[in-house]
Every structure is written in C-alpha cells, then in structure tokens.
Amino acid sequence: MGYNAGSYDVIVIGAGHAGCEAGLAAARMGSKTLMLTINLDMVAFMPCNPSVGGPAKGIVVREIDALGGEMGRNIDKTHIQMRMLNTGKGPAVRALRAQADKFLYQHELKKTIEETPNLTLRQGMVERLIVEDGVCKGVITQSGAEYTAKTVVITTGTFLRGEIIMGDLKYSSGPNNQQPSITLSEHLEELGFELVRFKTGTPPRVNSNTIDYSKTEIQPGDDQPRAFSFETTKFILDQIPCWLTYTSEETHRLIDKNLHRSAMYSGMIKGTGPRYCPSIEDKVVRFNDKPRHQIFLEPEGRNTQEVYVQGLSTSLPEDVQREMLKTIPGLENVEMMRTGYAIEYDAIVPTQLWPTLETKKIKNLYTAGQINGTSGYEEAAGQGIMAGINAACRSLGKKEVILGRSDAYIGVLIDDLVTKGTNEPYRLLTSRAEYRLLLRHDNADLRLTEIGHEIGLIPEERYERYSQKKEQIEQEKARLEGIIIKPRPEVQELIRSVGGSELKDGIRASDLLRRPEMTYEHIRLLAPSELEINDEVAEQVEIQIKYEGYIEKSLQQVERMKKMESKKIPVDIDYDAISGIASEARQKLKEVRPLSVGQASRISGVNPADISILLVYIEQGKIARVSNQ
C-alpha cells in the first residue's frame, strides 16, 4: 500500500553529478526540493576516473560555477593535483584539469547538500512517476512512498537496467556493484519513451605500495596555484603527482590471444560504447600499428592506496586483467584491488527533449546526465544545473532558461543532444563548438554570471565583485588605447629581448600588445597603471586586445546565427501541410520539433532548400494571421 510522504516543488531522482547540481540549483532558487537516491553513501560518487575537467570539460566546470553551481568550488576544496592543459596553444583550447580525492569530493558535496536550506536528501528508489493527463505530478518509491511535486528531474546515470560485464560474467548491477534501477526503466517504456542501450567501462584499480615508480615518469601538478571557481581564494599547494607508463608488445600479444574472451568481442555486449574513451582491447585492435599506448597511474585520494589505471578500461575476464597488468613497466608485481568492467545501461533518445531538458511527451518532467546519452561527470553536471534551473523556474512560474551555442559549451552540449541526438555516449569536444574563441576558460564569468544573478543563484556580494572586475577590464583597455609608448632606449631594449622589431615611432600601448611576442606584463613595465591590476583582469585585457579581430569575426557570425534563432517556429506547426519539403527532412522536423529556424537548420537530414521552404511557409502563416485579424 502506498502512503502520502510529502509535497515538494521539485523532486530530483538520483544524486550523482547531474542530480547534485539540479538539487542545489532548485533549492537555492527558492524551490522546496527533494533529492532521492538509492544509496546515501554514493552521493557525488566518481565511479570511473578520479578527475574533473580537461579539454572542453574544464570550461563546462567554469560555466557551472559562473551560473552559481557547485562542481568548481567542490573540486577546488578536494583535489590532489591541478594542471592547466594546452598552455602552448591559443586561449580557446586551454583547459584546467584536476585529480580528485574522490572520497573527500563525495564527503564535501554531501555536506554542502545537507546544509542547504530548502533541500531534503533522502534514501529511496523511485520505481514509478505519478502522471496525470500527460503531466508529471510526482514519484512513487519501492517502499510505497508517494511524493507529489510541481516538477520532477530524472538523473539516474548508468543505473537504468544496469548490467556489469567481465568476460563471460554478466550480472544486473549499477556502477561499482550498486543496486540497479530496473522498474523505473520499464516504467519509462510504458510511458512511451524510446530507450537505447549504451555501454561504458572502467579500468582496474591497483595498490600503490606494489608499484615500482622508478620505471614510470612523474607527472606533477602546476606550481602556480589554480582554481576552477571564480570565488576560490584558498589554494591547495600540497599536491600529489600522477605517473606515466606504457603498455608493451607483451600486453598487446596477451590481449590478442584473449580477444575471444572479451565481452566487447564475444557478442556479450550489445550496447554502443564511447568513441573517445575506447577500451584497451579496442585500442589494440583499431591501432594495431602502435607498439604501445599511454597508461596514467592516478591516485584515488590522499588516504587510500588505490590507484586508477587510466587507459586500461576493459571487459576482459579477471584472470586476464591480472596477467595484463604485470606486462606493463612498473606494474610487474602489482596487486589488483578492483577489477575493471564494462557496464551496459538504458538511456533515452535525447531528441525527445525540449532545449530546456523538459520531455516533450510528459510536461513538468526533466532529464539530465547520462540518461540523456552523454558520458562524463562534467557533461552530466552541466545538464544537471540547467534542468534544476528550469524545473525551479517552472515551479515558481518564471521564464525558463536556454543557453545558446554562442553562450556556453553547456549550450552546445544540450543543442547537440536535443537537435541531432546521439547514437553513442556523447562527449563534449572543443571541435563541437563553432564559436570556441568566444567560449573560453578565462571568460566563463563574463558570459554567464549575469544569467546566474538574474535567476537568483549568484548572491549580491559576488555579483558586485564581478561588476567591478568587468569595469576594471574596460578601464584598462581604454587606458592602453590612449597611451603612446615612445621609442626610448629601455623600450627598445625590452622589445629586442623578446625578439621583436624595434619601434620607429611612438605606438599605442594596445597596438604594441597586439604583437605576438609582447605580453601584458611587458606593457605593464613600459606603461604602469596607477591602479592595482590583478591577474584575472590582466589576462582578460591581453586576450581581448590580442584577439580583437578574431573575436569580432566570431561575434559577426553569432549575429547572423541569432537572426535565424529569432525566427521562431510555432510549436503546433503541421509539417505535413508544407509542400516541397523532402520526406527525410519532414520526418526529422516532426521528430525534433525545433523551436526556431536556426535549430531546424542544424538537424541532420534537413538541407538548405528545406529551410527556405520552411521560412516561406512561416512568413506566409504570419501574413495570413495578420490579414485575418
């Protein structure tokens, strides 16, 4: 028998990286929020690699922080190492990556959730949704508890009908041998959702005390203090290194010999795996010309001897995994503490979602994270904060928030999912963003803090600091535009020292900074400011002046795109009534139901001729409505 267990504005199912951001965002915006999770000990658990950030992903963490989310602050408090990647490349592809103390990461985030007003965290497995007349009204748990809500967010990760696979061993399980969620998956199918089967995997963990580090290469963190959050002022300087080793020809021979025992190659696994995180079996087969592959040894925390063997994700049986580890330099005598495994799980086809992450089929129901077909903690958290924001907005009667492709990587991620769908676990890459020069690591706050403040996630004190920073950047840029640096001996000497051409005449400080060999630090020496300019402001001034021409070109492209985005498509449009559209385009348009002509133009199978016909039809419809009035 069921019983009434309470009423909420927002209910979040799951407390992984998507669920944590969704629950915190909704509660901080003033919605009475309930987070339900199968196991309270697994809040913010990292079932795979103990790290946050990296190319594109690190920028997402900055964006979450700029909106008022928690991931950046939490990793800043709990990392064991931090590095800026791609420092030799342009600012568009630079990204921060941190190694996490995964246990401390969990502990700190759970503590934050427990201490957040308006937020209740409870253990319980949701088996069904309460749906009336196509509207989600709440959830029912395994124990019969019925919780009603104005909105519900599903963030179930890889738990939906999860199955762990190692060799010919296969059993029903969530990640790390947790209880899977089977009934909810079946219920979503009953409600008419189209589900797909995806697969991911994880490598073995080994005991640090049994590694011969003398045969590996040290990978230290950066000496310069770094942080993901724009709020962080205390930095962890006591860092722990990672270590680099490689597979050997013996490793590859062993894998080839046992390929028939890999679940990936025996036919045991039916789900599609992630393209950009292949198993070691895949790497050996697909890149058989490579004599070795990189293996990174990543400590899982400060108070554990467990080491994550990055690059060795596998579904080979346990006995082969043990042998395989011993063929790697430094791991000849290693003790395996946990086996690697593959996991298959259900995901929904994401074209069934609106750009707000609300499902098209059921009103007031949102989904975020791996259930939407993505891979990665950061992608999940980015969707989680947006689903939480929009679920809260709906519950509070406010306008929902949609980030565009020129606003954030989160916008690129969600637009790709809901417009194009995905036939494999989706990973965010810098190459997916056409405006990546605008979507940089360094300017996430300038892009998104105002949105976070407007919806109530950025407090006044933080917004005031942001406004001062923005003003300082503009003032310093204007100062450098107005200062003339003359060819004095000390100026010529500095320019010569960095390999530049000497000045013939006076030059504006901003123009001198545009030279590739010059930095803001050089300009500061030649034309010091009376005000103290901090590093964040200096970085912005340098990037905005140096890349001004390229940024201007990107902004012009954005303006053209926004014209297409501003041409809205009526939600109730009848695509069958539009003659001349190709049948594939008609089918895709009916499936995705784009909200704008811009979104329609990004659907695969919809070509420019179809867009032209659609534009004419919409314009004619507007004319007809006006003439009827």
UniProtKB/Swiss-Prot annotation:
The keyword Cell inner membrane does not apply. The gene is mnmG. This is tRNA uridine 5-carboxymethylaminomethyl modification enzyme MnmG. Belongs to the MnmG family. The lineage of its organism: Bacteria, Bacillati, Bacillota, Bacilli, Bacillales. Its cofactor is FAD. GO terms for molecular function: flavin adenine dinucleotide binding. GO terms for cellular component: cytosol. It is found in: Cytoplasm. FAD binds at residues 14-19, 126, 181, 370. One of its GO terms (biological process) is tRNA wobble uridine modification. It holds the Pfam family GIDA. Keywords: Cytoplasm, FAD, Flavoprotein, NAD, tRNA processing. It comes from the Bacteria.
